[in-house]
Amino acid sequence: MTFYDHTAIEPKWQAFWADNHTFKTGTDASKPKFYALDMFPYPSGAGLHVGHPEGYTATDILSRFKRAQGHNVLHPMGWDAFGLPAEQYAMDTGNDPAEFTAENIANFKRQINALGFSYDWDREVNTTDPNYYKWTQWIFTKLYEKGLAYEAEVPVNWVEELGTAIANEEVLPDGTSERGGYPVVRKPMRQWMLKITAYAERLLEDLEEVDWPESIKDMQRNWIDKSTGANVTFKVKDTDKDFTVFTTRPDTLFGATYAVLAPEHALVDAITTADQAEAVADYKRQASLKSDLARTDLAKEKTGVWTGSYAINPVNGNEMPVWIADYVLASYGTGAIMAVPAHDERDWEFAKQFNLDIIPVLEGGNVEEAAFTEDGLHINSDFLDGLDKASAIAKMVEWLEAEGVGNEKVTYRLRDWLFSRQRYWGEPIPIIHWEDGTSTAVPESELPLVLPVTKDIRPSGTGESPLANVTDWLEVTREDGVKGRRETNTMPQWAGSSWYYLRYIDPHNTEKLADEELLKQWLPVDIYVGGAEHAVLHLLYARFWHKVLYDLGVVPTKEPFQKLFNQGMILGTSYRDSRGALVATDKVEKRDGSFFHVETGEELEQAPAKMSKSLKNVVNPDDVVEQYGADTLRVYEMFMGPLDASIAWSEEGLEGSRKFLDRVYRLITTKEITEENSGALDKVYNETVKAVTEQVDQMKFNTAIAQLMVFVNAANKEDKLFSDYAKGFVQLIAPFAPHLGEELWQALTASGESISYVPWPSYDESKLVENDVEIVVQIKGKVKAKLVVAKDLSREELQEVALANEKVQAEIAGKDIIKVIAVPNKLVNIVIK
């Protein structure tokens, strides 16, 4: 049996593509464009795992398909290479993070090239390259000039073990850090913030303009979380102080019986009475040790302390005790709430715990038993009595505005973006702080502000980054003799990834971020493929920066990514015991088709789980490529199931894909190829071209491969294969298995040219219809012959053909024909005597 040798074929074609720059981005202005983007990887020390190529293969198939359809294709790759792991490694080993990063990139690139992806490597970007981050810094200076980058003293999520503050989005629900799982504490620090809130409405509205999964749009909507309501001002009794509360339900103001301030609220110390001072100070200290997520957990026990003061309810003059409680966040809304315990579960639990008044203002429910959180007509509400929710809200807002104690207000849960990190391995923030108290941005002519090379990259211990230790870089003097210090915080890893798709368009431009005409030509990105875990952060940040650049006239589109697709997760094979605990694969043995624990002998259940080092079920693509070939890996990952489904890795599935490719190889290299078309494969070939074309366009790669298999099965039943169909089939399979595609193309054409730009095959609509039908001929009710005849023959023609058939003539010889019944396209029934 003939098998193809992937170890010879694949490196040969990879070298051919590299030497000939086969995938250099097309620039023919008369052609349509297609920009296929992968989420670029962080080059970790572990290298690629088999999950990476799933998305990369999908965009590669699309890119190869679009090239063959006559598009200019931009399909680039680069490296999101700043970040904590490299710095952590450098601190652990004493090595330079830049060297570690360069080694990792070289390894990733080797692995990616071994998989046959058609990237234009002339456009490679690396976020740690000063020629790249010059423009990351330039964008920051523009944000600063527009007032969108500002410094603030804010309570941050401080991680002592990492020596840095992290964004809210990087804190896990259990209150630990996403990276490392370390404790997170709240600590006030001077930080750089980006005013993403200024774009909240546009970030919300423009989701309507993009073709993204609805689930991802919903995650962004929920993160931005727009609320319409009212601001209400409460005076503090016996003082000149007041505070503002934002509420979405101003209609329930008559039911507000107490107020709660965040422990960090600026008013707390000023209104706390001497009797309560110690308890309040103690509570504030405890709250500072908790993350926002831990504080707002609905299931946790309610805690709080009374300040000793009262606020006055503006609508009825009632006194409301003012408490502090950690479930109110200083960073959300105004950092103060009015509590309506009759109609809010959290307020109700708090009121019950601390014996506070509960006054119902909506009809329905028993508020002694539980909060009534549904809608009802208003009661105990003076001028709102008898009104429904919408009417009551409108009337209360009107009253608040007339009395000068409130106004209608739209708010968003979205917070400004905490942009500074107290780390070394990141882009320096291009700001200088002068001793006269002013700050200025580093002028564009002095960018990039290069990260200095230093051995001393441990956290400074002061809360500043290690750059505070590099004095010759840190200290500067102006022409007028005024001394200054450079900003020591660096940018987060999100910075470089918020605009990299723009740099691919013009990666070597030294004068500007990218040429306007090229940006006009290529934007927006046509398809962006990556994991759903980036749904909120990266995608929201990139959209924000893109909108700022749109306002600056740098980019021509409002949105960066027209279509987004999230590939599913490739799960590892794993095993569970009777308690449901996962067992590492090296502790499992297979006997008679069942799986057993090596040490205990217990029978185990096979169950897919996320690949992890601890379960020893991580599959390295290098091993797969070596054993089966890159084309097999590509075809297998696309054939596993729908691209957006999470599916378990299977060695059997891999073997099946390899066998299919061997059959393809044998079909083209051993079957007699003829210039004459017998017509036997007309229908299946044209069906295959039509189906594969449509399914690749819709990213239904698994069904496209299934159709290719249908063609191979049909072709194998024939003695010969029509040359045009052989070539067309090889073109169809080439985007999936590009090395094999090139090899078979040369076997058929000996052209010496790559298959990559050969025009995509078209199909003949008329051949999709069956022109012939099989009919049965019955004599005395028994089938005596089956005939293939032209479709839609008339009764008379059908009768003629049937009676002329040799088998039929033998049956009716010497007999009298009483009647012939012909049913077009079905049967002929002959009655004889």
From Swiss-Prot:
Family in the record: Belongs to the class-I aminoacyl-tRNA synthetase family.
GO biological process, one term: leucyl-tRNA aminoacylation
PROSITE patterns linked to this entry: AA_TRNA_LIGASE_I (PS00178)
Enzyme class: ligase
Keyword Transcription listed: no
Coiled-coil intervals: none
GO cellular component: cytosol
Chain ranges for the short sequence motif 'HIGH' region as given in the UniProt record: 41-52
Superkingdom per UniProt: Bacteria
Reactions listed under catalytic activity: tRNA(Leu) + L-leucine + ATP = L-leucyl-tRNA(Leu) + AMP + diphosphate
Keywords: Aminoacyl-tRNA synthetase, ATP-binding, Cytoplasm, Ligase, Nucleotide-binding, Protein biosynthesis
Designated name of the protein: Leucine--tRNA ligase
